[in-house]
């Protein structure tokens, strides 16, 4: 008993120990799991923060168009920081340490302010006169762009009378520069002289004006300047010349006007597209000025409100601005020309304004004018003015700018053919110095003592040896057009000489490889343009030829240049044996071309064989035709045999192919006062019998059932076409007669008698010549009784063995040619079997009365035309 109790106690203790151990392990696992979760959260937070910082750093780096990985972002950041450190060290080395330089101004800002205060500009000249650098402030003083002066000779802008003096000043320092020492550069390198410099103009034809300038500076050795900066001249010196400049001396001078200007143009535009907004009254007074205006024009809003805008405009621009104002008041919106605006600092800035008139929302009256002013540079203004004058801007030379390659400015614009020809004519492209040499060589030499400030050129100066640009362009246009007109092929005649001349173009010694390759590119672009224009011209020629062909076909159809046959056949197996033409004078028959009828071509030899066969048909058609070229009257009669070997006679005046399309309407038109078509139900046995004629109006539709035979009279109005189109549902024979216009002397109504008979299939072909005589007599009797057509009886309708179509026309005493066309085409007997022939005729008669009731009108109500 005790043993069992002790065993139970021991087992309970063991179980308790096991459970405690298990609980401890579970708690330890929970703690580790919680630590792991918290560590993962902190790690994820750190990674997210790191990614955010990397992304922000990558967005600040330049050229971040594509997604960069972390290593690339860090590498670019390191490169940027290293470069920034070098630039900072260089700027600290060249920092102005004097006390008179304000600490809150950078070197560039201080230099710009000093140049504006001195009315001068910086000029760096080599001892041979080559200009390697010029500051942008030269624009406000001499109206030259820096690109006009850089890499040119200073003697191109100095009168010839002062060349020797300036050259002597520079050459003396050149001789002494062989033994350059730091002591010499500190003591004897001062340079000061005065001379005249050429003022720039928008129009080169204007008389040249010289300004009296003062040069103050010193000489500097280029090898003593840090190679990375060259004191700001790094981007200006060409790489091809940089090695030769390393051991030479340049003169850095401040060039000032001897007589300062009180008001001058702003020399630089930091942000050319900077803009501000203002509102004006209809009298052009300021009503509003936004917050962007004061940094640009210097005026605060309250300083200009109520004042007129014309108070701030240059006097030379007032006329153009007044015209722009009138245009605005007329059209309600527009864009102004380039004009000069006077700032508060007494400087002129160039602006261009987009404006529009706003209207009151209730009464729609003009309220005020909203203007958006944009700052533009003088280079844009000069280029626009020269384009208006028809002067092409000279291409800038291959000069390197700061942070850019040396050839970045030497891009050739190949937009138009004219510019390409202009470049090709001037190839090899002259350098800027040669252009300036020609510019200054035609100016007269003036005495500096006589005109201390400005020297206008003499008007008697001989003109330049070369023609102006617009005259050259006119000559090139005339020669170019004459060459293109005289050549057989547009493309080869223009492209081959140009390409061959470009291929054989020698490369001058002073011309860089880049310029030559650019000219070759221009020639290739010219070739592509000419080839494209050639393809366009050829396409236009083909299209015009196609349109002309269609017009000729329509004219032949409308004005009766030939007889056109339009055929509607119910059975596609219908064959035409031959076509016979008979005329009063067989010598007048010309060559005939094949006739295309519903996809089947009747060749000329078949027509001629039909002409020689001389078969006689069972029906005749009389047609009067007026000829535009013949002066004699010809009358011919034409007959065609119909049967298993059918023949059609056709008179044609043209040699073009006649096409027979399908139509489902019937049109009989002529310029006569009126025409009538009589369609009897069947041919009577003798012509003495009488029948009633049903007449219906012009605007009512004729409806014929399949296989139905009717007696109708159709009155039609004159229409300017000559075609008869037969519907497929009419069993009146498958012949379409086309006739041209008639003479205006035809005054009376004309009647067409159309008679149908169903051909007899069992009748042999040998009996047809025997039936010719009674049928001709029957036709003559019908022509005499045209006003009334006899109507056969029911027995005659059922016993009619043959069906044919006869069309007759009244002939008038007209001097024009008369053609007689007769054709007969039997219906296909395979449509109805012989055993059911009588039954089908009775069904046709039963449907006759119903169609007359629905479709035909009372003949008493119709007046013949």
UniProtKB/Swiss-Prot annotation:
Entry GO CC? chromatoid body; CLOCK-BMAL transcription complex; cytosol; nucleus; transcription regulator complex
Positions with biased composition (Polar residues): 447-463, 856-865
The UniProt annotation puts the region (Implicated in the circadian rhythmicity) at 514-564
Composition skew (Low complexity), residue ranges: 478-493, 755-796, 828-847
User: Which E.C. number(s) belong to this protein?
Assistant: 2.3.1.48
Q: Give the region (Interaction with SIRT1) as residue ranges.
A: 450-570
Q: Tell me which residues make up the PAS domain.
A: 107-177, 262-332
Q: Where is this region: Disordered?
A: 392-411, 420-494, 620-653, 755-803, 822-865
Q: Write down the top EC class of this protein.
A: transferase
Identify the stretch(es) annotated as Interaction with NR3C1.
371-864
PTM comment text: Ubiquitinated, leading to its proteasomal degradation. O-glycosylated; contains O-GlcNAc. O-glycosylation by OGT prevents protein degradation by inhibiting ubiquitination. It also stabilizes the CLOCK-BMAL1 heterodimer thereby increasing CLOCK-BMAL1-mediated transcriptional activation of PER1/2/3 and CRY1/2.
Indicate where the modification Phosphothreonine is found in the sequence: 451, 461
Question: What is the top-level taxon of the source organism?
Answer: Eukaryota
Q: Name one GO molecular function term.
A: E-box binding
Protein name stated in the entry: Circadian locomoter output cycles protein kaput
Origin species, per record, is Spalax judaei
Q: Name the gene.
A: Clock
């Amino acid at each position: 008993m005790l043993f069992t109790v002790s065993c139970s106690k021991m087992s309970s203790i063991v179980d308790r120990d096991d459970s405690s151990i298990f609980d401890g392990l579970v708690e330890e696992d929970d703690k580790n799991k919680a630590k792991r979760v918290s560590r993962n959260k902190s790690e994820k937070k750190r990674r997210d923060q790191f990614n955010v910082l990397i992304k922000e750093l990558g967005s600040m780096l330049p050229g971040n168009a594509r997604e960069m990985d972390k290593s690339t972002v860090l590498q670019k950041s390191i490169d940027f920081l290293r470069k920034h450190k070098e630039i900072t060290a260089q700027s600290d080395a060249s920092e102005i340490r004097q006390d008179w330089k304000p600490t809150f101004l950078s070197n560039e800002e201080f230099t710009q302010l000093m140049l504006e205060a001195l009315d001068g500009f910086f000029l760096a000249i080599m001892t041979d006169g080559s200009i390697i650098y010029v500051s942008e402030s030269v624009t406000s003083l001499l109206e030259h762009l820096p690109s006009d002066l850089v890499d040119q000779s200073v003697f191109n802008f100095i009168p010839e009378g002062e060349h020797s003096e300036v050259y002597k000043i520079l050459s003396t320092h050149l001789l002494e520069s062989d033994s350059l020492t730091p002591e010499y550069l500190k003591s004897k390198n001062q340079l000061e002289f005065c001379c005249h410099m050429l003022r720039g103009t928008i129009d080169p034809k204007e008389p040249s004006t010289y300004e009296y300038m003062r040069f103050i500076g010193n000489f500097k050795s280029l090898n003593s300047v840090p190679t990375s900066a060259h004191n700001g001249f790094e981007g200006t010196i060409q790489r091809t010349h940089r090695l030769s400049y390393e051991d030479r001396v340049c003169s850095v001078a401040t060039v000032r006007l001897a007589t300062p200007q009180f008001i001058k143009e702003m020399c630089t535009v930091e942000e050319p597209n900077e803009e501000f907004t203002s509102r004006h009254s209809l009298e052009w007074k300021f009503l509003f000025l936004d917050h962007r205006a004061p940094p640009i024009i210097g005026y605060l809003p309250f300083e200009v409100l109520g004042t007129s805008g014309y108070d701030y405009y240059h006097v030379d621009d007032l006329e153009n601005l007044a015209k722009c104002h009138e245009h605005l008041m007329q059209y309600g919106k527009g864009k102004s020309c380039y004009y000069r605006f006077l700032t508060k600092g007494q400087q002129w800035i160039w602006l261009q304004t987009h404006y529009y008139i706003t209207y009151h929302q209730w009464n729609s009256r003009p309220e005020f004018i909203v203007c958006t002013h944009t700052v533009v540079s003088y280079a844009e203004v000069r280029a626009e003015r020269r384009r208006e004058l028809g002067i092409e801007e000279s291409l800038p030379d291959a000069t390197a700018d700061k942070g850019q390659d040396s050839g970045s400015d030497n891009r050739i614009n190949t937009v138009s053919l004219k510019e390409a020809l202009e470049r090709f004519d001037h190839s090899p492209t002259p350098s800027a110095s040669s252009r300036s040499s020609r510019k200054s060589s035609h100016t007269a030499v003036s005495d500096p003592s006589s005109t201390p400030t400005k020297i206008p050129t003499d008007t008697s100066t001989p003109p330049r040896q070369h023609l102006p640009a617009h005259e050259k362009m006119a000559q090139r246009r005339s020669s170019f057009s004459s060459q293109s007109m005289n050549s057989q092929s547009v493309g080869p005649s223009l492209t081959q000489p140009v390409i061959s001349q470009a291929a054989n173009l020698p490369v001058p010694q002073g011309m860089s490889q880049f310029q030559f390759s650019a000219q070759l590119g221009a020639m290739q672009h010219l070739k592509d343009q000419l080839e494209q224009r050639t393809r366009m011209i050829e396409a236009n020629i083909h299209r015009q030829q196609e349109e002309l062909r269609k017009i000729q076909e329509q004219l032949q159809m409308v004005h009766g240049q030939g007889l056109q046959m339009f055929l509607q056949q119910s059975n596609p197996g219908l064959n035409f044996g031959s076509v016979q033409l008979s005329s009063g004078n067989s010598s007048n028959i010309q060559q005939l071309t094949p006739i295309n009828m519903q996809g089947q071509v009747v060749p000329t030899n078949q027509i001629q064989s039909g002409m020689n066969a001389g078969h006689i048909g069972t029906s005749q058609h009389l047609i009067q035709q007026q000829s535009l070229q013949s002066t004699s009257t010809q009358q011919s009669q034409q007959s065609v045999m119909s049967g298993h070997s059918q023949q059609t006679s056709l008179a044609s005046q043209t040699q073009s192919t006649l096409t027979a399309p399908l139509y489902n309407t019937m049109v009989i038109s002529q310029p006569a006062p009126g025409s009538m078509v009589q369609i009897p139900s069947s041919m009577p046995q003798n012509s003495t019998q009488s029948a009633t004629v049903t007449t219906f109006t012009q605007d009512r539709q004729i409806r014929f059932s399949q296989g139905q035979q009717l007696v109708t009279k159709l009155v039609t109005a004159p229409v300017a076409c000559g075609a008869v189109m037969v519907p497929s549902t009419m069993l009146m024979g498958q012949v379409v007669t086309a006739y041209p216009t008639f003479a205006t002397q035809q005054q009376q109504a004309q009647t067409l008698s159309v008679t149908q008979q169903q051909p007899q299939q069992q009748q042999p072909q040998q009996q047809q010549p025997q039936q010719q005589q009674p049928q001709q007599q029957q036709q003559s009797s019908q022509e005499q009784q045209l006003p009334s057509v006899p109507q056969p009886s029911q027995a005659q309708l059922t016993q009619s063995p043959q069906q044919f179509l006869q069309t007759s026309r009244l002939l008038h005493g007209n001097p024009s040619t008369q053609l007689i066309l007769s054709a007969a085409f039997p219906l296909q007997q395979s449509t109805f079997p012989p055993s059911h022939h009588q039954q089908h005729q009775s069904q046709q008669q039963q449907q006759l009365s119903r169609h007359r009731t629905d479709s035909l009108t009372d003949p008493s109500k119709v007046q013949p035309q």
